[in-house]
């Protein structure tokens, strides 16, 4: 089987076979990170541009490490260091990048759909590293990888997602990704954070957090953005923690072997208690490790890896 | 000079709906003749329009001609060329130019430019408040003397209800109608398309129906209080149609318009972040689209306007949430509206009411095709099938979501006061 996608823009455009192939490839990549010399020559001579028009040290580092482990040349461009100055449009930026002949462009952008726009104007592969409140496919793939690793399979699992669904690209991509792989997704949040028509993505909306996580195999907690408070989404962090925070007491409602995930960074004491974040059910650090492996797999596959010799 | 339009089916609501020949003399409708009747006098030029529809000239109550201030998007000249090509013999440009049309000098400038263009008639709409800021009333009296016909802060609502009350009272004293851009900005804030499952799916912040209907209800309440004539612009959703229907039933002097995109498309047209489908109010759900059609059928919606809003690619070839709101419409309005007739949702007569008679009433004009009235007419070729091609547009801008769509019907000829201002090359 070949991986036929030029770009990775969202989870909707990936089939079950595509996702399985990415996860299988990522497992192989993970092994590289455990070697004493964590580098293979697979993408030597390839250029990967990391274009982050929105700050995110974590995601950017993860993509950067992934590129380096495959021996690609990665360059980082951000709003301040590049020619992305006021007045230059995203299409201008795309054309300028294209003139540098990159093989892959990783884009993080505050506007939903920006990677789609860029992808139409460049020959390079575009990987969406998070666009607006739309999609964050590499995060979802690493979540899928982490769950598959711990649970063996994805089919039939109960996945609970709790937090600001309205403003979360992780939530949207995860709902699409997990349901596509046969899991049941239930979400919960204050009603101010549930966007209209979210059920159309295939999830259920639980009336409260307790019923959301009852019998959960996986709980994914989302970060509460304190700066969104001006939008009047909930009265106080105290009340949010009481109604929608994951603590040890509440965790008992889920299955005994439930795993707890979080895309980070954590607001300890708000959406997740210290005890749970650092407890035995938490796989938050495994997610970070898998993030590098998944991103290596994506680079490898969009660069034509499945069409070339196995040089891992 | 005498012209005889021969063989057309004339549709003039409440007056004629049959095959007649129309005789134009010295800029006026001169006579209506039975088919085959002899010329009443010598020296008549005959235009054979057999098989065509002939209607009183179309009037668009809501256009943006962008001049003064944004001539790179459209000028009065190019906007009026587009109007003529679309079959419009009169248009009402909105005041959100730069400078704003909030004083008599700007009103006169617009009318001077329109006169120089010598195409469709122009009835400028002035601002409700100075600079569209929602604070101080503009000098409606002096502007009216200069030729202004109605007031609106279109592009923005008048946020403060007390200012709107005073504007309606003051305008009523001068016999001016008030057009409302109905939008609660606190609800619409940050939104770039219709709120709903599609917006949620593609991660675009939504504008709820209530952002519009709440303001429609407010305007009706204030009109009821002040006995003003209020006209709701670009109605897009079911709740607004309902509110207007109830307002009319109570006897409030409320009229309204919708635009072809609201009965032709839904929010799904945004598709893969197509900024050509970004407008304000946004394209709504299928239920809203059907409610708009229902409103046209039962008379709740009086007019079809275009909200012709030209933008250059600079404003549209960007991220969806960064793109400007608005689409052009003058050259596609009639053909998109004819689809309602072809689908038997509206009669041709009702369509002419929405696009000509009711807008004329709003402006206080008598545009019936009776002897002595100005010869403002539009001749439509109802059968010509063609594909909408923005490259053929005479507007300066190309921002339309209708490119590539096959339509049936086209304007053949537009005449203002006996002068042919547009004629399709055959
Ligand atoms: Zn408006």
Swiss-Prot record, chain A:
SUPFAM superfamilies: Aspartate/ornithine carbamoyltransferase
Coiled-coil region(s): none
Classification of source organism: Bacteria, Pseudomonadati, Thermodesulfobacteriota, Desulfobacteria, Desulfobacterales
Task performed by this protein: Catalyzes the condensation of carbamoyl phosphate and aspartate to form carbamoyl aspartate and inorganic phosphate, the committed step in the de novo pyrimidine nucleotide biosynthesis pathway.
NCBIfam families (alphabetical): asp_carb_tr, PRK00856.1
Top EC class, one word: transferase
Protein name, as recorded: Aspartate carbamoyltransferase catalytic subunit
Entry keyword set: Pyrimidine biosynthesis, Transferase
Similarity comment: Belongs to the aspartate/ornithine carbamoyltransferase superfamily. ATCase family.
Organism expressing this protein natively: Desulforapulum autotrophicum (strain ATCC 43914 / DSM 3382 / VKM B-1955 / HRM2)
Cellular-component GO terms for this entry: cytosol
Top-level lineage group: Bacteria
Curated annotation (Swiss-Prot), chain B:
Signal peptide residue numbers: none
GO biological process: 'de novo' UMP biosynthetic process; purine nucleobase catabolic process
CDD domains per record: DHOase_IIa
GO cellular component: cytoplasm
Stored SUPFAM superfamilies: Composite domain of metallo-dependent hydrolases, Metallo-dependent hydrolases
PROSITE patterns to which the protein is assigned, alphabetical: DIHYDROOROTASE_1, DIHYDROOROTASE_2
Keyword match Coiled coil: no
Annotated residues for binding of substrate: 64-66, 96, 280, 311, 325-326
Record-given protein name: Dihydroorotase
Organism for this UniProt entry: Desulforapulum autotrophicum (strain ATCC 43914 / DSM 3382 / VKM B-1955 / HRM2)
Lineage of the organism: Bacteria, Pseudomonadati, Thermodesulfobacteriota, Desulfobacteria, Desulfobacterales
Gene: pyrC
């Amino acid at each position: 089987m070949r991986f036929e996608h030029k770009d990775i823009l969202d989870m909707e455009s990936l089939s079950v076979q595509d996702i399985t192939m990415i996860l299988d490839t990522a497992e192989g990549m993970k092994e590289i990170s455990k070697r004493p010399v964590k580098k293979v020559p697979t993408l030597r001579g390839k250029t990967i541009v990391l274009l982050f028009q929105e700050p995110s040290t974590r995601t950017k580092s993860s993509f950067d490490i992934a590129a380096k482990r495959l021996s690609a040349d990665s360059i980082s461009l951000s709003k301040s260091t590049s020619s992305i100055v006021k007045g230059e449009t995203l299409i201008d930026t795309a054309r300028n990048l294209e003139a540098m002949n990159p093989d892959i462009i990783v884009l993080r952008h505050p506007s939903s759909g920006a990677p789609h726009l860029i992808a139409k104007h460049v020959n390079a592969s575009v990987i969406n590293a998070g666009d607006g409140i739309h999609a964050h496919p590499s995060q979802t793939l690493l979540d899928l990888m982490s769950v598959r690793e711990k649970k063996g399979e994805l089919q039939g699992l109960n996945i609970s997602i709790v937090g600001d669904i309205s403003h979360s690209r992780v939530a949207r991509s995860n709902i699409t990704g997990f349901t596509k792989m046969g899991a049941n997704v239930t979400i919960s949040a204050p009603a101010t954070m549930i966007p209209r028509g979210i059920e159309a993505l295939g999830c259920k909306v639980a009336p409260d957090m307790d019923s959301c996580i009852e019998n959960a195999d996986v709980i994914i907690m989302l970060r509460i953005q304190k700066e969104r408070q001006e939008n009047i989404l909930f009265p106080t962090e105290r009340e949010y923690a009481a109604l929608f925070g994951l603590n040890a007491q509440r965790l008992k409602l889920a299955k005994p072997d439930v795993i707890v995930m979080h895309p980070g960074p954590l607001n300890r004491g708000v959406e997740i208690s210290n005890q749970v974040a650092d407890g035995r059910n938490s796989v938050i650090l495994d997610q970070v490790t898998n993030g590098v492996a998944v991103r290596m797999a994506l680079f490898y596959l969009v660069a034509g890896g499945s069409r070339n010799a196995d040089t891992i | 000079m005498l012209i005889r339009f021969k063989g057309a089916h004339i549709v003039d609501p409440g007056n004629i709906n049959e095959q007649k020949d129309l005789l134009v003399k010295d800029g006026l409708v001169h006579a209506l003749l039975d088919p085959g009747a002899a010329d009443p006098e010598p020296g008549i030029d005959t235009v054979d329009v057999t098989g065509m529809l002939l209607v009183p000239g179309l009037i668009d109550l809501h256009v943006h001609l962008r001049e003064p201030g944004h001539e790179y998007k459209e000028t009065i000249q190019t906007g009026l060329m587009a109007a003529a090509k679309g079959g419009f013999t009169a248009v009402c440009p909105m005041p959100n130019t730069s400078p704003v049309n909030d004083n008599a000098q700007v009103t006169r400038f617009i009318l001077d430019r329109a006169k120089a263009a010598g195409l469709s008639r122009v009835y400028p709409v002035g601002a409700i408040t100075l600079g569209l800021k929602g604070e101080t009333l503009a000098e409606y009296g002096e502007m009216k003397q200069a030729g202004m016909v109605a007031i609106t802060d279109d592009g923005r609502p008048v946020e403060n209800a007390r200012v709107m009350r005073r504007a309606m009272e003051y305008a009523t004293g001068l016999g001016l109608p008030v057009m409302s851009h109905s939008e609660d900005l606190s609800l619409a804030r940050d939104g770039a398309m219709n709120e709903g499952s599609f917006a949620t799916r593609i991660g675009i912040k939504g504008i709820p129906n209530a952002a519009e209907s709440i303001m429609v209800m407010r305007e009706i309440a204030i009109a009821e209080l002040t006995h003003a004539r209020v006209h709701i612009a670009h109605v897009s959703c079911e709740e607004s149609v309902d509110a207007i229907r109830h307002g009319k039933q109570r006897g409030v002097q409320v009229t309204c318009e919708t635009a072809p995109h609201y009965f032709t498309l839904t929010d799904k047209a945004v598709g893969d972040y197509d900024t050509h489908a970004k407008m304000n109010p946004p394209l709504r759900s299928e239920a809203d689209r059907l409610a708009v059609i229902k409103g046209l059928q039962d008379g709740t919606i009086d007019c079809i306007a275009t909200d012709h809003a030209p933008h250059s690619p600079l404003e549209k070839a960007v991220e969806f949430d960064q793109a400007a709101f608005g689409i052009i419409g003058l050259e596609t309005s009639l053909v998109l509206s004819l689809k309602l007739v072809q689908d038997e949702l509206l009669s041709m007569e009702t369509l002419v009411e929405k696009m000509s008679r009711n807008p004329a009433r709003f402006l206080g004009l008598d545009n019936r095709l009776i002897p002595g009235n100005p010869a403002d007419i539009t001749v439509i070729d109802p059968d010509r099938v063609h594909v909408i091609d923005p490259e053929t547009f005479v507007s300066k801008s190309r921002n339309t979501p209708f490119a590539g769509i096959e339509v049936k019907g086209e304007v053949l000829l537009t005449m203002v006061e006996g002068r042919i201002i547009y004629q399709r090359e055959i």
